[in-house]
Amino acid sequence: MAQALRGTVTDFPGFDERADAETLRKAMKGLEYGSSLEDDVVGDTSGYYQRMLVVLLQANRDPDARIDEAQVEQDAQALFQAGELKWGTDEEKFITIFGTRSVSHLRRVFDKYMTISGFQIEETIDRETSGNLEQLLLAVVKSIRSVPAYLAETLYYAMKGAGTDDHTLIRVVVSRSEIDLFKIREEFRKNFATSLYSMIKGDTSGDYKKALLLLCGEED
């Protein structure tokens, strides 16, 4: 699979409310690899996982920030019917709603879903899906709830344990350094009882370490 497929769900259009979706979509074309990222996805994945990735790449997420409470109720009920109340799972319903609704709308849907079903949407995804699709849907939910919290978790697990996922570490720190890295640092400290700065300092070395720490800023 081409290197272009590596990254986080926030690389897909529509997750960063401060960035233009079409600009992000163009940035993901991956021309240096001789094909678009969508071509890579179709060539290297299959099933509902492939379908979800393609929907995310197509940048059809509703940009309207207004909340239609009737539509929120309808989507929450549809997800409940497609999962917990169904023998088997209607994966297409999850893919359509998760891949096309606005960020602000989905946050309300997740709240309404909890009210209707008594379950967090993450619990339902865990029970009703599996494998790569489950992991992708959970990543979408995390990023919808909070991009900084999702990326803080991504950075933590890029460095936790033996070895370091240098690609993810560089990608996130560099791409978010002028967007929301301070908020990511706050979430990192809150959720992992250590600072992003100190973990980078202990997990990297040389000029690579110096560059990342410079972008990261001072110790929290």
Regions found by a protein language model. Name each.
Residues 1-220:
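Structural signature for extended repeat/solenoid scaffolds and their inter-repeat hinge/linker regions
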